[in-house]
Amino acid sequence: MATLTTWMNNVRAGTLTRQANGAHSFRYDEEWLRSPRARPLSLSLPLQYGNITADAVYHYFDNLLPDSPQVRDRIVRRYQARSKQPFDLLAEVGRDSVGAVTLLPPGEEAHLEGLRWQTLDEAQLTALLTAYQSDIPLGMITSQDDFRISVAGAQEKTALLRMGEQWCIPQGATPTTHIIKLPIGEIKQPNATLDLRESVDNEYLCLALARELGLAVPEAEIITTPRIRALAVTRFDRRWAQEGRVLLRLPQEDLCQAFGLPSAMKYESDGGPGIAAIMTFLLGSSEALKDRYDFMKFMVFQWLTGATDGHAKNFSIYLLPGGSYRLTPFYDIISAFPVLGGTGLHLRDLKLSMGLNATKGRKTEINAIYPRHFLATAKAVNFPREQMLAILQEFAGHVPQAIESARRTLPADFSSHVWQAITENMLKLHARLQQGLQAL
């Protein structure tokens, strides 16, 4: 039997146990259960006394880790982890996870202490962000073993601390403030090669467009050195307090975790939640009206921008005291429009991750979707028609201005290909949106 102590903002919340047969269980600490600050680690692991042995325990902790088997393999080799099973990986890199979770070995405590960090110069930052090319987990080249982080997702990413204008490696229990993403590169598929070498510019523009259109998204900036180009995204699961002297971790989880699902079921086509399931789930939000409105608005935004990867792990909730929750900002938005043509995809190949309702069956193909399908979906999920119409009309009236406003935020060396591919296709769908509304 092996255990890891689970902490939330330096308060002991419970214990993760792995039995000799590989079975996992979780037990909340009794003092945590009695605390007015108590909240569940996950909605799939509700506050209760005694051991929780459901499959959701394994799935929750597994979802704290990177999806990529290659990244997991690098963590095993870098830290000589016993295996690439979630428990063994989190024993090595669980000190700074998504949300407020810190995982430590028995006997080691998460102390509330002052912020500590090591500043990075340009050469050190470059070395840190190119280490994965030497088969080292991204960001984990420091000889100081206390810098071990876990950032979920499929993309090469790490996390760093920003202090003023300086990028830093946090030390001790100091959290990180930014997710750092490198270009995705080329993805080989059976019938196409998806060129996402400019994914940094792609995501930056998608976030800028979402922000201009009134959607809550994190701030982002492109960072460059002579050898790297990366996207630094402000973590919305961190918050400065006490006039910048304390950096808090905010409890949150993605929807795979909230639904108790493995990451292999993040797509609706693989059994994961779709629009109907998520809209029903958001009825329980502490801000249900706002969250349901924003979620449906984001569905339209994904269509307009060709953002085809809106699966359950790309939506998250804040976990609030007592078990209440609300939607976090939207994140991990990348358009598929820049990969059209050449050895890439055809427009007819682009499909949304979550289907829309149609007269017959479901619609996922971006080129086959019209405003009426959003209205049909709204009806199916008990979302008021007038609100869905208001969302569609808002996009119809504001997309060109949002594109122009986003353009003014771009750095001078921004990819012209990414800009043209996203905005030109977005304007084509915007024209379809306007025509579709006129036809209603």
Predicted segments with their positions:
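Phosphate/dinucleotide-binding and metal-coordinating scaffold of catalytic cores
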Residues: 1-312, 316-440
